[in-house]
Amino acid sequence: MGPPVDPVPAGDSQPKSADVVIVGGGIIGVSTALFLAKRGVSVVLCEKGHIAGEQSSRNWGWCRRMGRDPRELPLIVEALKMWGDIEQLVGEDVGFRRTGILYLCQDESDVEHHSEWLKTAGDYALDTRMIEGRALADLMPGAQKNFRAALHTPSDGRAEPQKAAPAIARAARRAGAQILLRCAVRGIETEGGRVSGVVTENGLIRAGTVVVAGGAWSSRLCRDVGVRLPQLAVRSSVMRTAPVEGGPDGAAWTEGFAYRKRLDGGYTI
């Protein structure tokens, strides 16, 4: 779907114990490792393959507040502020750009639906607005279809999935986190009704706290400690293009179709 994932080399050896063990080397796992390590917490991250080997390198890379459930927005607003400082935080360019996102309206019912969200945007002083005509056409050069209007948030943006999680993992390692690759966690251990560690394919790591960030595999691990984690599997088709000159710089979505320009000049569709 996208360019190759930036490599994070192996090298750390498995310790006998840590304050926190994180299961999963996707963007949630590596971000947790980074901020714990920066606070001086002893943290070990266990990844069964390589960093960003699954969904964290295959997603759209959208960094957005637009269209979110109002209950998510306080957290998402803070998260986007952090994306704005990501290069300073991790010391690398992960492709974050505030290129804006469009929710395209094909008819009046779409306009009505998306206009409802403008009330939420106003509560958080977002720069979201409904655009149409020339304002919309200018954001979609070369478009062969005329859309009725679009919900637009210029300050939302995108990052490169193949770069972001690996860069954060490297920063976490520099901050003191131990990153174990090709080290699958087989189960979570408990003693006296409390988490006591994890069993990996290389043995036991004792820890009083375990963060399960295993993506599609999280529910399987959570069952070990009696936690039911509902998950929904969704299958979709995505393609990428070679670099294209011109074309829209931002990202857009409508029913059945979406696109995002990548840092290499191509599009994920």
Residue ranges of model-derived segments:
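Glycine-rich Rossmann-fold phosphate-binding loop(s) that bind the pyrophosphate
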Residues: 24-26, 48
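Dinucleotide-binding Rossmann-like beta1-alpha1 core, especially the glycine-rich loop
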Residues: 61-139, 256-269
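Flavin-dependent oxidoreductases
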Residues: 31, 188-269
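Helical element adjacent to the flavin cofactor pocket in flavoenzyme catalytic cores
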Residues: 151-209
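Extreme N-terminal leader/targeting segments of oxidoreductases
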Residues: 1-20, 38-39
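Glycine-rich FAD pyrophosphate-binding loop
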Residues: 37-57
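Conserved Rossmann-like nucleotide-cofactor binding loop
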Residues: 28, 51, 217
